[in-house]
Amino acid sequence: MSLSPHVENASIPKGSTPIPKNRNVSSIGKGEFLGSSSSNNSSFRMNHYSNSGQPSVLDSIRRPNLTPTFSYSNGVYMPESHRTSSFNDSYLPYDKNPYAKTTGSMSNKSNMKIKTKKNAINTNTRKSSGLIYTTKVDKELSSIDKVNDPNINGLVCAGKTHLGLYKFSPSDRSIKCVHDFITPNSNTSTRGTTSLLPKLSKRTRQNKFSTIADVKTGFNNYKNCIAVCNNSTAISIYDLNKSSSIDNPLITSLCEHTRSINSFDFNMVESNLIISGGQDSCVKIWDLRSNKSKSSNRSDISINTASDSIRDVKWMPGYNFASKNDQGSSTYGNLKSGYKFASIHDSGYLLKFDLRQPAQYEKKLNAHTGPGLCLNWHPNQEYIATGGRDGKCCLWFVGDNANAAENTVLNYGNSPSLHVPNTSLNNSGSLAFPKLTINTDYPVTKLKFKPAYSSNIYNSLLGISSMGDEAEVRIYSLARKYIPKHVLLSETPSLGLVWWDENLIFNIDKGTRINGWDINKEPTVLENLSKNTTTWRDLDGNGLLSVDQEIGSYEVVEPELQPTSSTTCKKHPGTIKNPKNGNPENQGIIGGIKKGFSHTGLTSFTPERPPTLKAGPTFSTKSLTLASGASSFNSSSASLTSLTPQTENREEIAIEPPCIITLDIPQIFNNIRLTKIAHSRKKNVISESSSMKNSPVEKFKYLARQLKFSYIREHNVSDSADTAYKNDIENIDVVKNATETHGDNTTTTNNNDDGDDDDDDDDDDDKIIESHLLKKYNFPENNTWATLMNEKVNNKKSKRNSSSSREFDEKDVRSSISSISASRQSHDRSRKIDKNVEAELQEKIQTLVDLISIATHNASVYLSIDDLTNFKIWILIRDSLLWDLKWMTSSQISSDNASNMDANESSDFEAGENLKTGKEFPEEDGAGTSGAESLVEERPQAFRANSDEPSDAEKKPVSKLKEQLKNTEIIPYAQPNEDSDEVLTKLKELQNQRLESRTKMGETVSDDVIIEEDEHEHQEEEQPHDSPTKSAQFHASPIAKSIPILQKREHRKSFIDTFMLHSPNGYNGDTDIGNEDDNISPRFTYNSVSPRSKVSSLQSYATTTSQLETFKKLSSHTAPIIGSPRHAPSRPDSIGREQLSSSLTKKLAKCKKIIADPPWDTKKLIKQLYNQATETGNVVLTVNILFLFQTIYQITEIDIAKDAIAHFLLLLHRYELFGIAADVLKYCPFEDIMGSEGDQSSIRLFCERCGELITNESSKEKLRAEAQQTGNKKIMDKFGYWYCDSCKKKNTSCVLCERPLKKLTMVILPCGHEGHFQCIQEWFLDENEQECPGGCPGVAFI
């Protein structure tokens, strides 16, 4: 609300100097900078030192007039030059401001600068309209107080050389100095001046007050009294009514303190009492009626607080607040007002006393971590606000414990500040925490509550003034402690404040100005704050941050009061209970206390002394009677009992959190550009994936969040799947046992039925195994393996349904029964496998399963952003890992079967399709072709149980290779020649070496590796079969007899094995993972046969003359593979006693065990992918490969891997991906990944008992040696830092379970007790406890 020019002109009293506008220091003249000529170079400043009351030497230096750099008045924090002045913009227009005339000599450049700054002010900002009074005095000011007379609009201001009475006029809004009690008038004689200060000489330098210069005024009968420090240890009392030149205004001087006085105060109920406190840590109470002489060096009551120096001391106020209702009017008061007082000390302690029991304080609170500087009582509730050097303003409840529940207030979500718990020295002391803490950025030297009644403490207003250079007075509402309600700006730093009434507040500043504001006309900080703010982000300057929040309020809704009785009329808000002089026969409060506590033995309590004969001009009686003191309370005691407001617990005010929106400017601009291009080309809006492609930063963030970098944390997921799998197996065993039990009571029909039952059990078992592996591998339903397994189930069902139609001869039935019994025997022997080897193999399998799952997940992540290149890379890695997993699972299952096979069992030549290519070849016409069923087995070896191995009679031929070999040109012989014997001997030796090497490595021997030959026991002549009709019949028959060969073994089909056999030159083995000792290289001879053909490459040569040469090429790769345990070697179907040719035997004799890794080898493949990623700069893929495969395949040097991961961590930190960086460090397989940077974040633990550094190296070496001797790695779990080797004692135990704290530890901040995370969670969350488990008082958890 703006005012008219008349009002603005009227606000400036005639003859006074208005406050200038804010200007740059460089534009102020020399005289203006130094201040008025009447001001001394030594300016006053209040000092707060615990050891001395003397001023600092630095305080004698005049400081320039400073203005705050930032202000709340214009919304967000704005520079001083851009903000709206809260004390001149509404009342002092620039053309009317006299201060502007003095700056007329300023340059045009400076004037232009002022105009520019004024134009920069936000037009939406509400300007200040609350500044009503302002004046500048010629004397230095340090303290201010109001005259407690409602008929006089008076203020008292004091300084070193000034004690003045000022009156303000609401009509013309002026402030005038009525009388100066130090500087005499022109008509005052020297003698009169000397009579004012009898103990001072006539020299000017002695006409000064103490550096403390606190000033207070009396109440009721003593409302005309002014108390001020005459010197450091004396209090002078002046009479306001004696302002003429002939009267001596000095009433008396109170001097008993041995050190400087810091504070004093008048009692509002017993107005004849005055209390003082100083550096001597003593509280002294004076009765003005007993001190009628001009000087008194003896107090009525002296209390030694036995603490540090007293900074501030205050009586409990005794306001009478009037309230009207239907029945009339009533008043609210406090029965304890005349007896209670409090003091705050340099040590930060807050002490509360009762005058009726002065020997012991009622409460002792540790209010501040540093020196406490000031305190103030709430007008009508037993709360005290304290301010300290630590920059905190705390609200404390100091009422009786019995009434604590009635006065309990909510904290409204504000956690209390941490204070050091202390134990009170008296029985009534209690451990307490502040109800509210307001954090400021400066020491708080002055604070005062608004003198208004409030039933809810949070609806109270509190004015705060600082000790620093903040040129402002902040008014806080306790309902909103973070944002002040009003910020009243002044030209220079504020020195003090006083509330005149509920709406008017005055302050003084270092610029010797007195300012007065009407807070009802002053804008709140929230009104000037911007409702939404936008600022640049700190990271690289490429983003915006916006915050939007509702305004809220500064008040808490409270119910209306319903008074029930009233006996008095409405009074002035500032009036106090008027005690009656009453009956002189009774004693006053001081007399009653002296009689009641004469037996307490208080050393500082002095006995009653005889009254002085000389009476003062304003004192009629010696002391106030007890009846008069009691009557002041009895008049309203009845109404107080029923009308005292009770503060009720209410629900917290829900303040919605701010909504934060982040914007990435480069991405926004890029999206705008792409949108315009798409619109011009009439395309739709780009998808999220395409926008991610155009923003490399977002793509990197997305990949870092979605990709999996470590298989260590995948064990938890796999463990849960394994648990479910084990539960399923247990359920199967239960069903089997129940079936077997039931089967014992029945009769079995025949052996074939038993075999069928076993097959059914195996099918149920295999079904669960297959579903479990499918879940682990994350295969889709249309995957090749899933299709084969589903087809196997259908074939099994159809086989059982059509078993009656099949025709078996006696040999087939016997072979089937013998195979079943052999499988059962082998299953029993498989239980005797070495447990260590089995556990090691299971661990390798689990690692491969986790890596396959991660590869599948990473591939899907790249597919979601249409990155097909990296998608194919991860699919290739997954297929390679599947190959390794297939070999491990198959070798584990079939290892015992291979060791128990008979030497005369036959083996068919295996041929199949490539698993990794996944191509399906069309079937060719002709009698020499075979279907797709002949190229792959019904169920892969990895999914097949030992007992489910088909017999020779049930096996179908894989191809017509045997028929082709029968038609080859052979030479029968009766005795093998030397060349053939040498070849066979060589093959035998190589097989034995292979078996020994596998046994030493602790691995199971697969039947694909060992070739058993028995030339002396089983020798059968192979008969020629030339008829083409026989070949057709061979494929048509469901059960075909195999060709008799010299070497026979149990047939074993594998889908993945066909991958290597489908190459044009046959199968080439592979070396083991990470085997660096194999120096064997392959010899590949590719032919011109189309890879689409389903039959073997040898079949296409069946009708040519080069059949023997083709077989020689095939036979050149039949040598066993040494050091290649992962792949089974291919070998011919039979080695008969027929000698094919001399060239063939020579070729076989010259065969070498030189076979290198095939192209699909996992280690070789991953190394190539790593090199490609480093060359192309694919950071994510490079780091991902190092994380997953470095420890398994040794992709690169360990130092290079650590350096790459360290740079990747820095990149994550740069893009604020701190959570992912923490996971990378947590699951990284390497130690000291950050190198030298990691040493900077090391944590040193010290023993709580002996104080030594906890290293525990001796116990670590002892446990390590024990672990090496016993081979038990779990022994190292005993090592930790929860004990100390130096003192041989444990550190802090859990407060709940009292066990050592070894892992995650929680600390209860209020009391410092520690406990396990599970224990603390159970105590506070599960059991809903709020106190500490150790029994500490106070609420520890809200």
Swiss-Prot record:
Matches recorded under Pfam families: WD40, zf-RING_16
Q: Where are the zinc fingers (RING-type)?
A: 1294-1336
Q: Name one GO biological process term.
A: positive regulation of TORC1 signaling
The record's Gene Ontology cellular component field reads: cytosol; GATOR2 complex; vacuolar membrane
Which sequence positions carry the modification called Phosphoserine?
S1037, S1081, S1088, S1090, S1124, S1134
The keyword Metal-binding belongs to this UniProt entry's keyword annotation = yes
**Extent of Low complexity compositional bias:** 630-644, 815-824
Q: Which Gene3D superfamilies match?
A: YVTN repeat-like/Quinoprotein amine dehydrogenase (2.130.10.10), Zinc/RING finger domain, C3HC4 (zinc finger) (3.30.40.10)
Name by which UniProt lists this protein = Restriction of telomere capping protein 1
Name the gene for this chain: RTC1
